[in-house]
Amino acid sequence: MNHLLESRVVYRVAGRDYRELIFFSFMAAALFIKFYFLEYEISRFVVRFPLSVAASAAISAAAVISVSLFWRRGRLPLALLLDFLLTGLVITDLLHMRYYSDLFTFHNLGLSAQVGEVSESVFALFSPRDLLYFIDIPLLYGYYRIFRRISVHPFFRRITSRRAAWSLLLFAAAAGVVAFHIAGYSKKVPGVLRSMWDRPAVCSNVGALTYHLADSWNTLTDWICRRPLSEAEMEDIREWYEEHLSKQRRPQGIFGVAEGRNLIVLQVESLQSFVVGLKVGGREVTPNLNAFIKEASLASEAYNQTGAGNSSDAEFLANASFYPAASGVAFTRFAGNRYAALPKALLDCGYRTLAMHGDRAGFWNRGRMYPALGFERFISKKDYVNDEAIGMGLSDKSFFRQSVEMLSKEPQPFYSFMVTLTSHYPFSFPKLLAQAGFDTGEYSGTVVGSYLSAIHYFDREFGAFIKGLKKAGLYDKSVIALYGDHNAIPRWDSPTLSRLLGIDFTKDHHWRYVQRVPLVINVPGVKKLAWNQKMALGLANLPRTLALLLGVDFESGLGSDIFDAAEAPVIFRNGSYVVGKIFVEPAKKSAVHVESGEARDYAAYAEMTERVRKTLDVSDKILEYDLMPKILRK
């Protein structure tokens, strides 16, 4: 006893009470190690950047410093609670990566009701060694219980002005490291922290803790800015929607013309209309697509309607017929909504519904959004044999070959939504250029030249895909729709494209007009579908069009069908639109002919401009408040 008292006196006199410093240093190190190993797990899916480790270390230190400045009696429970919550976040991320190939996002808290449906699969991914992530919590508590008695001083000391100053200095340094890193990444990839188009990639660049801070901020601002929808507003939306549905018709000779057929929809990465029929050095860029179009029906005036979500927005338009989100990305923000999309409508009619893509399931949140749209199964990168990777994922050659094999074994009728990948910007993947075997002449080494090679490669594999469908006996049993998802060539490379096409892209109307994407539909036994080939169209028109052909009632979404003779505007996310050949831009109060550039009277489009504004407003509210179940409730 005397020895203990003596030691306590010595400890007090010497002033060497490092117990609290050791406690919080160990806690900070433990948190850093947890997130380090989380990021190591993520690095199996994406490239890891060393600076992400520094960002996680800085935030771990800042979090611990914050706790160390609290009221003395509250520090222990607060420290253990913080450690437990952050460890739970690490485990949640690990399980999400193993199951979805994606990270957890607070936006998907609305999906918590679905956890029970996949709980067995998720817990099967939990390893007993994952419990080691929690080991520091009892160690911290045990350390406190043992060492609090070795000094007459309290374990947690009062905050002196010197300690507060050092703590604030360290906190500011940590915050500065993170802020500097975020600013650099945001400048390099503008808007990525808001859109979160690839969460693992964001995490690998800025660190797991920084990713979660940005995700929390996005979710919080979305919730705070979201006001309750009044009953009057709800009734106004319902009336607008009923009026919209009342204008829809069943064109004679169209409804059910392909009843009972399979449906194959092919979304082609970066395919633009100008390559259709184009020759370079006497060779067709897309000979197989050209041949397919001769048997099918081509909408030559279809426009890209995507927003910040790029490819995912095209998928959303083509399956749900809603416009891109006003902010952020629909696929990441509204995966918890209840949709009555085309896949769901076909599923209810006895179709097998599949989505097929050679990329990770977590990219663009597809692993969560596809089931919400009504796809029974998502065949992603992990389900394919990754025998040939080009660029961002599985090559089109391997993707098409394996997909035909899978489809030949599926019960019919089925709806297969397929997304290609190889012709992705910047198109200059060495293996792709080598396999394309397309001489682009004077354009070799340019973005445009690489793009032409990439599309020629796609075209060759598309031809093999069509042959594969015929060999499997699926071609004559299937409606096949094909479209390009968005534009390919950036504006800064327009001089090269101008030289190729002989068009002056310094004039905005020419640049707008070249942003068209091909939309092709082939119905077995039907040579050409009867629609106005000169009418401007968008992907929002596709779901109802396909439903009509298959004889399925489709009452969801905001698009009409391509057989509707009424000239409807093709609406873009920024509120501009094309009607016929006139491009109307309300922000500039201008209306111009897309081919000639001739100015038109903007005032003449006032009524349609208001109609477009209302349509976007309805689309936004339906998504923000998940209104489809209420609207469709009879």
Task: List the predicted regions and their residue ranges.
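Transmembrane and membrane-interface helices of multi-pass
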Residues: 2-218
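Generic alpha-helical structural element
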Residues: 77, 104, 123-124, 128-132, ...
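Short secondary-structure junctions and interdomain/linker hinges
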Residues: 95, 122-129, 141-154, 227, ...
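A diffuse structural propensity rather than consistent per-protein peaks
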Residues: 95-108, 127-133, 230-233, 311, ...
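Membrane-anchoring hydrophobic helices of lipid-metabolizing enzymes
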Residues: 217-242
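Solvent-exposed soluble domains appended to multi-pass membrane proteins
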Residues: 238-634
